[in-house]
């Protein structure tokens, strides 16, 4: 009876805390903290894609519930250890994982983080309720025969293998050096079964990717630069050519003042027989967001003959609007989003006539979002 009463009182306290604030602080003292929080995200989607089979309109719903467990323990000299786990329960019935990492360091100083996480965002896209790109590729997955919208995130993180990062703050200056370890063949669609410029990927071994970032805050302005590259030769090979020999560069700037936030981004990838340049700008004013991204893919026939020669460009517009605190419920939002994207094939020569199709895709989404 006493245990039942204690559990009932604890449950009532937790419910009261959840009602008052987003997230629950189970422990919050000078020696450390532990909290449970999360969010719910459900999307109702419409898409009209020429790249889709039969060119049919698509209607679907997707989403997930994220639960976050986070804790830190402090020492009297300012050092700390921390852990975070974010399991995802998808509306499809699958269970996935966002972040899962351990970190230690000195508050407002240096830190070492290991596990699964995302490093510094070198291509922030603002309020991107719905953002996709023409073709069969994504901005973090290379698919042969499709244009690639490179965004300086091949070594950013949340991969299936190991990851570690060192970061430090020096006043307005922030520096981080991240590394991803292990099999990175999943960067290419199909992995070991996939292709690159028409050639079969035939051998794979573990990669070692590094990604240093330097950022500086100047009043309302922030600027950051990065580079990412693989240090292991012949980590991914197609027809005797080391296609893991890839080096990318990123530059991003942000201006935030009052209700305005503006991002400008540039990313460039130097890869085998192709170069990928992407530029983007987006703005957020109050709850309205608007953005544009343009990708230029230059192909040549040096290592692989007769695949493609010339340029393929991708242009993408997107817009979003957020209704906050719907029904006067704190942290409950309804978001509207739309995008339009197109491919412009300017190749002088290509071996596969079905590749790099000039397709126009568009979509619209209503998102229900609640943070708890």
Located regions from the model:
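Residues that define the transmembrane beta-barrel architecture of outer-membrane proteins
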Residues: 32, 55-65, 95-100, 158-162, ...
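Outer membrane beta-barrel
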Residues: 24-45, 56-184, 215-219
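Gram-negative bacterial Sec-dependent N-terminal signal peptides
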Residues: 1-24
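Transmembrane beta-barrel strands of outer-membrane/channel proteins
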Residues: 38-44, 83-87, 114-116, 177-181, ...
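Outer-membrane beta-barrel "beta-signal"
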Residues: 323, 359-372
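Solvent-exposed loop segments that connect transmembrane elements
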Residues: 50-53, 141, 184-205, 230-246, ...
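Detector for outer-membrane/organellar transmembrane beta-barrel domains
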Residues: 205-207, 211-322
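Repeated loop/turn-to-beta-strand initiation elements of outer-membrane beta-barrel proteins
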Residues: 78-81, 108-112, 172-177, 220-225, ...
């Amino acid at each position: 009876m006493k245990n039942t009463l204690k559990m009932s009182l604890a449950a009532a306290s937790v419910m009261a805390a959840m009602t008052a604030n987003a997230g629950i602080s189970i422990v919050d003292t000078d020696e450390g903290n532990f909290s449970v929080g999360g969010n719910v995200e459900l999307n109702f989607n419409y898409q009209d894609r020429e790249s889709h089979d039969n060119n049919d309109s698509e209607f679907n719903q997707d989403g997930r519930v994220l639960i976050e467990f986070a804790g830190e323990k402090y020492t009297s000299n300012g050092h700390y250890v921390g852990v975070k786990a974010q399991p995802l329960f998808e509306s499809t019935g699958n269970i996935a994982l966002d972040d899962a990492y351990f970190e230690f360091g000195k508050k407002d100083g240096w830190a070492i983080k290991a596990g699964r996480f995302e490093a510094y965002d070198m291509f922030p896209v603002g309020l991107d309720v719905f953002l996709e790109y023409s073709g069969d590729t994504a901005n973090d997955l290379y698919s042969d025969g499709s244009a690639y919208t490179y965004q300086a995130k091949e070594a950013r993180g949340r991969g299936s293998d190991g990851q570690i990062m060192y970061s430090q703050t020096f006043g307005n200056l922030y520096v981080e050096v991240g590394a991803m370890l292990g099999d990175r063949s999943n960067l290419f669609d199909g992995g070991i079964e996939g292709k690159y410029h028409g050639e079969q990927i035939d051998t794979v071994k573990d990669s070692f990717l590094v990604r240093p970032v330097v950022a500086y805050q100047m009043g309302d302005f922030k600027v950051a630069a990065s580079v990412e590259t693989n240090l292991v030769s012949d980590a991914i090979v197609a027809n005797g050519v080391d296609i893991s020999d890839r080096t990318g560069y990123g530059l991003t700037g942000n201006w935030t003042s009052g209700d305005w936030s503006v991002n400008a981004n540039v990313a460039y990838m130097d890869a085998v027989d192709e170069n990928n340049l992407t530029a983007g700008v987006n703005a957020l004013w109050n709850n309205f967001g608007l953005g544009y991204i343009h990708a230029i893919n230059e192909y040549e026939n040096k290592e692989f003959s007769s695949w493609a020669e010339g340029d393929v460009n991708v242009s993408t517009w997107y817009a979003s609007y957020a209704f906050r605190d719907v029904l006067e419920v704190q942290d409950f939002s309804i978001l509207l989003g739309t995008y339009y994207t197109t491919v412009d094939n300017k190749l002088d020569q290509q071996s596969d006539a079905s590749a790099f199709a000039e397709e126009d895709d568009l979509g619209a989404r209503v998102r229900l979002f609640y943070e708890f």
